[in-house]
């Protein structure tokens, strides 16, 4: 792997932001390696390196096996069995030691030591990949908690494991201690931002997109990224918040909650293309907004939280754009919409038909009288030109002899339209 790619995948700081830390780093690298052909080998090699820096043997095996399938000749594609045996013994010894230590605390009824013993054991289980045992150990800490700070720390531990387990529904309950912190507490702002981001990820996982959007846009950019970088990065907040808002908010909401939101605008500075897309939508340049987003679709398909939602979010944004585009008009030509939203390629007519059928667009497509409408317009244009010529002749004190032909300008109906049209109800 060259130095540039190594920096991209493994550096702590990149593009002016703090990249996520903890177990989610491996998740993201491994996901990219399994999802992208161009980045496959480099991402999997970085995942192997990340796994080997920790204690999770199963993750190491998964990364090496995937790399072997993609690039069997790479040195990292061969299992380091000596490391695996050594790490397995180390993990086993550590587990036995921590369990014995905890049992001693229980025998001596030392409440604070029991809490810390469960925490140490839970973190150890988390590090070696036994997230169920980790959750169990953290859960046992509840009875020994004696302060608000300890309750908050426990909530963050439970949230971290719940996110890894994709147990979205439990996250809200685990965050209650963070949300109940008094605003006068110096840590309140940081804790509430952590809570907003975690709640946003959980709502996204449950397809509650508008709720998730508000969670992300209400996060404070003044909070150091180190507070929440085990679950997300500032760049994630900008992307998730921006995309979800575009899919669920109208133009006024986008302006008020994102562009006029000083705190969220700081997040958007890290992902300027998202800010441009939002600005284009708010200004009514919907096709430009969609074009920007489409150019970044491959990147979002590599995100561990966004990937499965990208098709739905993009479809919702496109539907919203079409509806907003049609709003000022009572009638629009299909070829005009084709140029605005599709360009060369399949007709937009089928898409509009589906939107009308699903009740997303209150309109109808007039494709029956198009020939008559086209002929009528041609007649109208011809008669209009004749009338202009006649007015010019009269203004020049000239005279045109001849009878008035039937079907003059006053006989032309003004309500006819050209080609296939969309008529808005």
Swiss-Prot record:
Keyword Nucleus among UniProt keywords: yes
Localisation: Cytoplasm; Nucleus
Gene: csn-1
One Pfam assignment: PCI
Family in the record: Belongs to the CSN1 family.
Keywords: Cytoplasm, Nucleus, Signalosome
GO cellular component assignments: COP9 signalosome; cytoplasm
Organism name: Neurospora crassa (strain ATCC 24698 / 74-OR23-1A / CBS 708.71 / DSM 1257 / FGSC 987)
Function: Component of the COP9 signalosome (CSN) complex that acts as an regulator of the ubiquitin (Ubl) conjugation pathway by mediating the deneddylation of the cullin subunit of SCF-type E3 ubiquitin-protein ligase complexes. The CSN complex is involved in the regulation of the circadian clock through its control of the stability of the SCF(FWD-1) complex.
Subunit structure: Component of the COP9 signalosome (CSN) complex.
InterPro entries according to UniProt: PCI_dom (IPR000717), Rpn7/CSN1 (IPR019585), Rpn7_N (IPR045135), WH_DNA-bd_sf (IPR036390)
Family matches, as PANTHER family: 26S PROTESOME SUBUNIT 6, COP9 SIGNALOSOME COMPLEX SUBUNIT 1
Ranges of residues in domain PCI: 219-379
Chief place of localization: cytoplasm
UniProt protein name: COP9 signalosome complex subunit 1
